[in-house]
């Protein structure tokens, strides 16, 4: 699987175990090119709009139900309702902390490919944050007795408020990437371990889970990537994101002013490093049509090169089903 929660107390033996499913809630706030303003795709009705109403089913119920049945779920729209967003990255010094520790046999080094860097707060059409920075890599080692001489990277965020935050990691898929990169998420509920297949899905945000964190900067609120692996190769480290955040894509010289989860998929796709033709087939002239196509284009690009979509170039994620609530 792309992502596996090793700390899960039960192992799903049937059902959707290790199945990869794409789910989206459709619509979302978008830029109306003809009116030069942001707005909803559907009319207001009974004190809501379809752009908001479908999310009230998909985010708290449908996606968790599928995940509890064993599935790995991807959504092309932002899934986290947290308005705050903190990114910890080797390229972007801030109040948060990024730390590397090597071992006797393995040292961190710069990878030969581009990585994520947040060099601005507002992005224009076509700008890709996953092409603006660098990423790090280190050779893997077998598990050691008594956990001595371990190599790892740490991302320690300085969070503006106590609350629940989605945790997204990122990396680049390298020629000798491993399928069992070990991530540990330290949060208020303890420590949760994940194995991430870095052979697929490089160059975008990879969702691990949503956790409770305290305000500020502390050693029980962080993400750790170890170089421990059962395979001979490398693990890659890039930015880690805490929280869904606010929309930061400018259209017509203005941003939506809304949390990212309320925006359409077109803008989440750009922030997630998707190629321009995935989210802007109309070359920035029709965001409504682009948003409709972005949802499926993102899934096709993610699954490109996998057994389910072998002829299209992409990130190799074996997404075998798409489900949407319209």
Q: Where are the predicted features?
A:
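Short beta-strands within extracellular/lumenal beta-sheet-rich domains
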Residues: 133-159
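Non-catalytic propeptide/linker segments at domain boundaries
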Residues: 1-39, 76, 237-258
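A short beta-strand element within beta-rich, extracytoplasmic domains
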Residues: 151-175
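Extracellular carbohydrate recognition and processing domains
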Residues: 188-217
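Functional beta-strand-loop-alpha-helix junction segments that form "active/interaction loops"
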Residues: 74-85, 261-311
